[in-house]
């Protein structure tokens, strides 16, 4: 199967448009381009030639990954993301904890990304809805490692695959968690 060039095509388009990476202007530009793409599937991302596929996590802390996931307690959870975008924060028995940026609306996602990239971010309470535990036994694919230069692109790709609820409910619940601390 041919490899796609989603990440490099977007990077080249940004360069041609004179967009400086990791700026407010670039965040707005990538959000607009992502909206124009429509739905992006995991297959599209997995076939991208810039994405490194891994069978297991090697030195995962602080790295961003995408993967297919089938929550162990999917029948009792109100919803979950079956294709999360996770920055791994810690290892745990049988899995890991991470920040799934898909749980944040795009504006807050941009601010969270700024914080993760080392510039002005959000207060800690804003990350609360993104913190999730993932069990490695429930991962249903290889791990797609997203290199830091592509974090900005990956953050705004419309790739979340919600099970149990729509994106509107997820964002409302996330905002509620932020307000309530």
Q: Could you tell me what each predicted segment is?
A:
Residues 72-80, 107-111:
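Intrinsically disordered, low-complexity coil segments
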Residues 64-71:
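Hydrophobic beta-strand signal
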Residues 94-102:
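Short, solvent-exposed secondary-structure boundary/capping segments
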Residues 60-61, 91-95:
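A short, compositionally biased
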Residues 75-92:
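Short beta-strand-centered aromatic/proline hotspots
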Residues 3-64:
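Mixed-charge, Lys/Arg-rich low-complexity intrinsically disordered regions
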Residues 103-181:
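Intrinsically disordered, low-complexity, charged/polar segments
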Residues 85-87, 99-100, 115-117:
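General detector of folded, globular domains
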């Amino acid at each position: 199967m041919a490899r796609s060039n989603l990440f490099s095509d977007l990077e080249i388009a940004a360069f041609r448009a004179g967009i400086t990476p990791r700026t407010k202007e670039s965040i707005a530009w990538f959000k607009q381009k992502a909206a124009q793409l429509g739905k992006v599937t995991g297959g599209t991302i997995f076939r991208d030639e810039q994405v490194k596929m891994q069978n297991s996590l090697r030195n995962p802390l602080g790295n961003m990954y995408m993967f297919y996931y089938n929550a162990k307690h999917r029948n009792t959870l109100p919803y979950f993301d079956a294709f999360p975008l996770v920055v791994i924060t810690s290892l745990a028995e049988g899995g890991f904890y991470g920040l799934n940026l898909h749980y944040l609306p795009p504006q807050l996602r941009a601010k969270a990304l700024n914080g993760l990239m080392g510039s002005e971010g959000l207060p800690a309470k804003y990350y609360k809805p993104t913190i999730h535990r993932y069990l490695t036994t429930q991962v249903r694919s290889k791990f797609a490692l997203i290199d830091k230069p592509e974090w900005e692109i990956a953050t705004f790709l419309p790739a979340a695959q919600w099970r149990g609820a729509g994106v509107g409910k997820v964002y409302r619940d996330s905002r509620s968690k932020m307000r309530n601390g």
